Amino acid sequence: MPKYIFLILCLVLAFAAHAQTYTLSGHVLTDTDDGVGNVLLEVVDATETVVATFTTDCSGDFSIADLAGGTNYTLRATKEGSPFNGNSTFDLVVTSRHLLGIQELPSPYTLAAADVDESGSISVMDMLLMRALILAINDAYPGSNWLFFRPGDPFASVEFDFVLNADMTNFDLITIKKGDVNGSANSCE
């Protein structure tokens, strides 16, 4: 009889631990630490089911509660808005100075902003795409207008995998606007 009680107790504790819920929270910021609003965050489970959504306000803060512990999740980040936001001829000048070797772009994030065709390098093609957007010849860049990064990771993504075994705070994302090399985009648009 004590063996059965012990077995039942172990099963109850295992189910109780699995039923534990946690919170994922953090900030969506520019590379200059300004909050970014209107970012849609979706938490997706392994079956591609959206289990939670959150849209940031202008502070960029987010908190997503009641996520089951021990589950593999993916956080998807998207931001809509005008492709023209933050794109100007000054961005073309700064990018051309970089290409000519006159003045290097100051960070991996500005390098990513200048790589509007997402080829992995900055070229004249990026400048042509910037020019076409500024002159309204094109109405968007290839892919998404906003790129997302985890701090310290220079590779952009829109999906970030995680497993919750406790509340996860400071799950921060850095975002930049494509083509906005000088950081002038309205991050709350």
Please report, for each region that a protein language model flagged, where it lies by residue.
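Bacterial Sec-dependent N-terminal signal peptides
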Residues: 1-23
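Cellulosome-associated attachment modules in secreted, modular CAZymes
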Residues: 20-189
